[in-house]
A protein has these predicted regions:
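Conserved beta-strand positions that form and line the central face of beta-propeller blades
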Residues: 10, 65-66
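Short glycine-/Asp-/Thr-/Trp-enriched loop segments that recur within the blades
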Residues: 14-22, 67
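Acidic/polar residues in short coil/turn loops that connect beta-strands
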Residues: 4, 28-30, 59-60, 81
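Beta-propeller domain segments
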Residues: 22, 39-42, 49-52, 57-59, ...
Length: 189
């Protein structure tokens, strides 16, 4: 990745402000820059290809989709020593206290993770039923589920030796906690 550092802007192609628009960055071993940008709403169709997605920032400043269907991908990082990309995602609200689980997942190039048409693989979003069966059919199941509305924000893979051996190679995920669950949850690592 090359950027004209005489400017403070490497890309202005981040879409319209609003919703879950403040984002995180990660760079792979080759210096390619990835940006996670959340949706512009809770459960809605959208026409901005860079929202609810992870994109690559091209040398010319334009964004190229890497993976889509990620409602609010917040924590983004590469597994240490690899170019394996992972994110933690805050899923949709309004489906009840126990749906839809937030998650951590390995992000694959070209993959679709469900939002807004499906969740947990091919479980169709009731309010958008029948709208995009093609996307529902290819929606990926996340790798690790967290309790709904726990709001995972930070993600760090642990390779140190300070903690017991069973933690090595695992992930620490910081949860912000719920704002809308009947019984608060989250607020933990």
């Amino acid at each position: 990745f090359k950027c004209d550092w005489s400017s403070d802007v490497c890309s202005s192609d981040l879409g319209v402000l609003g919703g879950h628009w403040t984002r995180n960055l990660a760079a792979d071993s080759k210096g390619t820059l990835y940006v996670a940008i959340g949706s512009n709403g809770n459960i809605n169709d959208h026409d901005d290809p860079h929202r609810a997605a992870v994109s690559v920032v091209e040398p010319n400043g334009k964004l190229t989709q890497y993976a889509t269907g990620l409602r609010n991908p917040v924590g983004i990082t590469f597994y240490p020593g690899t170019d394996d990309l992972y994110v933690v995602v805050n899923e949709r609200d309004g489906e009840g206290d126990e749906l839809v689980p937030d998650y951590l997942t390995h992000v694959e190039k070209g993959a679709f993770y469900g939002w807004p048409y499906a969740y947990l693989g091919q479980h169709e979003e009731p309010s958008l039923k029948g709208k995009r069966p093609d996307l529902v059919a290819k929606a990926k199941v996340p790798d690790v589920l967290f309790r709904s509305h726990s709001a995972p924000l930070g993600l760090l893979f642990y390779t140190g030796t300070q903690f017991p051996a069973e933690y090595r190679g695992g992930a620490f995920v910081a949860h912000h906690g719920s704002w809308n669950a009947a019984n608060p949850r989250g607020y933990k690592i």
